[in-house]
A protein has these predicted regions:
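Chalcogenol-based redox active-site neighborhoods
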Residues: 1-180
Length: 180
């Protein structure tokens, strides 16, 4: 499923840096404190640090796979839309949902506008956080993954991409949140 026939911007440095397949080899174990980061929240125009949420509220990190502002991973596009539609369900549970993409700021702004995103979309064009969370990569972009962290930043649930199970369902993520 192509989300667009516009391939402009696809062959950039990020594409070549992430071209060779590296499987998800996440060594983060349940109960570990996850790596912190500071990224730009394109949706709300502010800087977000993961440690800002520690002791305040749990966090769901949804690493997603977007090639350009017009080309989405066919497995991730429906997941992005479902997460956006369910954003209030996470907020109702006093949980922050942060989506992380490898697109640059310009591309990310277009994604926010075109998809009408309500949830924070954090831009990580260097892919440093994808690497820190060991999500893997293939064919020009990092692979998707989801992580549920409790209030102190400990990993309570993780889902890594596989061809049999691309992304954790909304129901699975909400159940993981409800178990916190």
């Amino acid at each position: 499923m192509l989300t667009s026939t516009d391939f402009s911007g696809l062959l950039n440095q990020r594409f070549f840096n992430n071209f060779l397949p590296i499987p998800a080899t996440n060594s983060l174990a349940k109960g570990m404190i996850t790596p912190s980061f500071e990224l730009t929240d394109v949706t709300n125009g502010r800087s977000v640090t993961l440690t800002d949420f520690r002791r305040r509220r749990p966090v769901v990190l949804a690493f997603t796979r977007i090639f350009t502002e017009k080309q989405y991973c066919p497995f991730c596009f429906p997941h992005i839309k479902a997460l956006n539609e369910s954003y209030e369900e996470f907020l109702d549970r006093d949980v922050e949902l942060l989506m992380i993409t490898s697109t640059d700021l310009r591309q990310s702004k277009t994604v926010v506008k075109d998809l009408g995103l309500k949830m924070p979309l954090l831009s990580d064009p260097s892919c440093n956080n994808f690497r820190a969370y060991q999500t893997g990569q293939a064919l020009g972009a990092p692979l998707p993954a989801q992580f549920v962290l409790n209030k102190v930043g400990q990993l309570r649930y993780k889902h890594l991409f596989s061809f049999l199970d691309h992304n954790a369902s909304i129901e699975t993520l909400l159940k993981a949140v409800d178990r916190l």
